[in-house]
């Protein structure tokens, strides 16, 4: 069984994807982490994430970089969004994701284009979203808990900028697959969102 989970930044898709993978006993890949590693590798080598050649060179990152705590920062998240617009970068990372999706044990992948590009044959495709203001508030609250001084307006502006890049790129834009199940987490608690996601997946599996 393959489950594809897509959605914009701070929609809650990562939390839901991990919970679904645990519930259904599937290997899990956070594909966004790969793009963050590319962005971080470019940063560490003083490259330009907006330059296709520098971004492509960033794909040659060591596996150890996937354990770098900096990958989870807002700054590196922004770099990931910037390198991901380059078709060369997406092509370089696609094979790793496709191979993971097609392993015999099944898989759950979370990203931006899993249901549309990486695993269009997935048994279940879930598109997780929430209003930009709600996503910005979540990110703001998270950063406040970690003692990071930031303005809500700046977080919201960054969310809008990332959405525009993700949805507007020519290659594999962020959008729900035609047969994706839509889940808006805007008014849901984490527990409520997890239960709703499990129910949606189980409902689709019963019909297939």
Regions found by a protein language model. Name each.
Residues 3-5:
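Hydrophobic anchor at the beta1->P-loop junction of P-loop NTPases
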Residues 124, 174-190:
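Phosphate-binding beta-loop-alpha motif at adenosine-nucleotide cofactor sites
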Residues 8:
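P-loop (Walker A) phosphate-binding loop of NTP-binding proteins
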Residues 21-31:
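Post-Walker A helix-loop "phosphate-sensing" segment adjacent to the P-loop in P-loop NTPases
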Residues 16:
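Hydrophobic positions on the alpha1 helix immediately C-terminal to the Walker A/P-loop
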Residues 33-106, 116, 133-137, 141-145, ...:
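ATP-dependent small-molecule kinase phosphotransfer cores
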Residues 13:
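Conserved lysine of the Walker
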């Amino acid at each position: 069984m393959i489950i594809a989970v897509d959605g914009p930044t701070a929609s809650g898709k990562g939390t839901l994807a991990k919970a679904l993978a645990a519930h259904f006993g599937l290997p899990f890949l956070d594909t966004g982490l790969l793009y963050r590693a590319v962005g971080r590798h470019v940063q560490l080598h003083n490259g330009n994430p907006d330059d296709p050649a520098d971004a492509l060179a960033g794909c040659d990152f060591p596996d150890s970089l996937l354990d770098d705590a900096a990958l989870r920062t807002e700054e590196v998240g922004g770099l990931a969004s910037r390198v991901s617009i380059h078709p060369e970068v997406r092509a370089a990372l696609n094979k790793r994701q496709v191979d993971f999706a097609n392993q015999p044990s099944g898989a759950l992948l979370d990203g931006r284009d899993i249901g549309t590009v990486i695993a269009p044959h997935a048994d279940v495709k879930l598109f997780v979203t929430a209003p930009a203001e709600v996503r910005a508030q979540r990110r703001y609250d998270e950063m406040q808990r970690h003692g990071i001084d930031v303005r809500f307006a700046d977080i919201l502006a960054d969310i809008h900028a990332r959405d525009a890049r993700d949805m507007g790129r020519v290659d594999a834009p962020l959008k729900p697959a035609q047969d994706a199940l839509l889940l808006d987490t805007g008014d849901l608690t984490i527990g409520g969102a997890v239960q709703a996601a499990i129910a949606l997946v189980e409902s689709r599996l019963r019909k297939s």
